[in-house]
Amino acid sequence: MALDSMREIFDRMAEEGKPFWEIVLETDMEERQVTRNQSMAKMLTMWQAMSDAADGYTGRRRSVSGLVGGDGMKMRQYNLRGEAMTGGYVSEVIAEALSMAESNACMGRIVAAPTAGACGVLPAVLLPLCKYEELSQHQLLEALYVASGIGAVIAYRACIAGASGGCQAEIGTASAMAAGALVALRGGDGQQIGHAVAMALKNLMGLVCDPVAGLVEVPCVKRNVIGAVNAVSVADMAMAGITSQVPVDEVIDAMGEVGRRMPVEFRETALGGLAATPTGVAIQEKMRKSS
C-alpha cells in the first residue's frame, strides 16, 4: 500500500475532506486495482476470520511443543468470577489477546495484523468493544482500514518483522495499529490517531524478539497482552488531549533505527534474552532431542 508517511495521510485528509479510513481505502483500490466494494469485501473477510477465531477458541488445544495453550480460557473464567482487577472491557481484552495468540501457536486460522506473532493485539481491542458499544459492521471495517494504513506506513518507514527490528516491530506495530483503530472508533481526528500511534510505539520501543526455542510461543503469546493493553491506554490518552512531543513519523523512524541497530541475538534468532536463559536453552535442547 503506497502510503509512505502519516503526514501524507493527514495532508490528504485536509485537502480532500475525507476521513483517515477512506484515504486508506482509496489507496488500496488504486494499488490493487479493485473497486470499493471489492476492497471492503476483502476487509470484511479479515474481520470475519478474526471473529471466527475468537468463537472457535476452546482452550483445550496446546501447541505441539506444549509450551502454550489454555491460558486464554483461564483468563476468561477468572473474568467470569468477577475477580479481575482490571475488570470489564480491559480484562476481556487480556483474555482475547491470549486466546488469539494461542490459536496461532496451536495452528489455528488467524489474521496476521501485521504478523502472525502479533495477531492477538488488534482483535483483542476490537472484539470485546462490540459487547460494550453498539458498533456497526461498517464502523468496524473503517477501524480496520485505519489500522492497515498505520501498519502500511510503519512497514514502509521502519519494519514490522521481529527478524528485522525485534519485538518492537511486531507487537509495537500491532499496538500502534490497534490504538489508531480505537481512536477512530471513538471519533478522534487524524491528529489524535497520530498521537496514539506515536505513544504506542514509544512505550514499546526497544523490545527485543527472543522466542524460546525459536517458537512463536514464549514470550510471544503474553506479549500480545501488553500490546493490546498499551493500545487501550494510549488511545484513552490521545482522546483526553494528551499529545506526543515527538511527531509520529519521527517516532516511526526512530523505531526503525533502533531495530536496525539491535544486535542479531535479539532479532528472532533465539540466541539472546529469554531464549538464552538456562531454562530457555534446556527447552530448546529437549525439543531438539524429541524431533
Walk through the language-model features, giving the residues of each.
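Acidic-glycine-rich active-site phosphate/pyrophosphate-binding loop
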Residues: 87-104, 139-158, 203-211
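Active-site-adjacent structural elements in folded domains
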Residues: 107-110, 160-166, 218
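N-terminal glycine-/lysine-enriched basic segments
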Residues: 155, 160-168, 174-175, 179, ...
